[in-house]
From Swiss-Prot:
Any matching Pfam family: GrpE
Segments for region (Disordered): 1-26, 209-230
InterPro entries: GrpE, GrpE_coiled_coil, GrpE_head
Keyword Ribosomal protein recorded: no
UniProt source species: Brucella canis (strain ATCC 23365 / NCTC 10854 / RM-666)
Gene Ontology biological process terms from the UniProt entry: protein folding
Gene3D superfamilies tied to this protein: 3.90.20.20, Head domain of nucleotide exchange factor GrpE
Similarity section: Belongs to the GrpE family.
Major localisation: cytoplasm
Gene Ontology MF annotations: adenyl-nucleotide exchange factor activity; protein homodimerization activity; protein-folding chaperone binding; unfolded protein binding
Comp. bias regions, Polar residues: 221-230
Subunit structure and binding partners: Homodimer.
UniProt protein name: Protein GrpE
Cellular component, GO, one term: cytoplasm
């Protein structure tokens, strides 16, 4: 295309006489035009190469930026996940602190309640009937015990009442066995000392007696199976 534009107006330059001034001028003009065309082509090729190099450099920069963006996004997601886990752990710790803050205090108060109950149980029934003052004192101590247990209950402490339930080592402590073929094996038949729990944690296991020699309860479906007496 550039060659066609730079062709001399007279196509038969090879037939011109170099000794003729006019022909010599025409040949010179044709040579100048040819050189200009070649220089223009060279500049165009150089510009194209430079543009291609700039495109490649831009593409490389874009690739680097995209990689950096992906890495930063991954870091941000990891930080967000860690912050969410930290928030959940903190919330759980706060809830546990609220629920179990009085654990040691409640355990000490249960010991006091046990002592009050032992004192009440140690008073003979005939002595209560014979002495009105002793009876009034006993009633006052019993009211104090009930008020103490109610106060603990308001703060999340609940009494375990396992009599008639299947023995659970997580909540009960077996003190003795009672032969009884009429009850499923390992049924709680007597509570020696009440147990207590706070939230989902055992504050004190219930001390119990369990049955022995009755039908065994299946762990899967609760069906009873016969079991020989030991």
């Amino acid at each position: 295309m550039a060659d066609e534009k730079n062709k001399p107006e007279n196509p038969d330059l090879d037939q011109r006489d170099i000794n003729n001034p006019r022909d010599r001028e025409a040949l010179k003009q044709a040579a100048d035009d040819f050189l200009k065309a070649r220089r223009a082509e060279a500049r165009a090729e150089a510009a194209a190469d430079e543009a291609e190099g700039e495109v490649d450099e831009t593409a490389n920069r874009i690739a680097v930026l995209e990689a950096d963006n992906t890495e930063l996004k991954d870091q941000m997601l990891r930080v967000a996940a860690e912050m969410e886990n930290l928030r959940k752990r903190t919330q759980r710790d706060v809830q546990d602190a609220r629920a179990y803050a009085i654990t040691n205090f409640a355990r000490d108060m249960l010991s006091v309640s046990d002592n009050l109950r032992r004192a009440l149980d140690a008073i003979p029934a005939d002595a209560l009937e014979a002495d009105s003052n002793l009876k009034s004192l006993s009633e006052g101590v019993e009211m104090t015990e009930r008020a103490m247990l109610l106060a603990l209950e308001r703060h999340g402490v609940k009494k375990l009442e396992p009599e008639g339930q299947k023995f659970d080592p997580n909540f009960h402590q077996a003190m003795f066995e009672v032969p009884n073929p009429d009850l499923p094996n390992n049924t709680v038949v007597q509570v020696v000392q009440a147990g207590y729990a706070i939230g989902d944690r055992v504050l004190r296991p219930a001390m119990v007696g369990v049955s022995k020699g009755g039908p065994k309860v299946s762990a899967e479906n609760g069906a009873s199976t016969s079991e020989d007496n030991a």
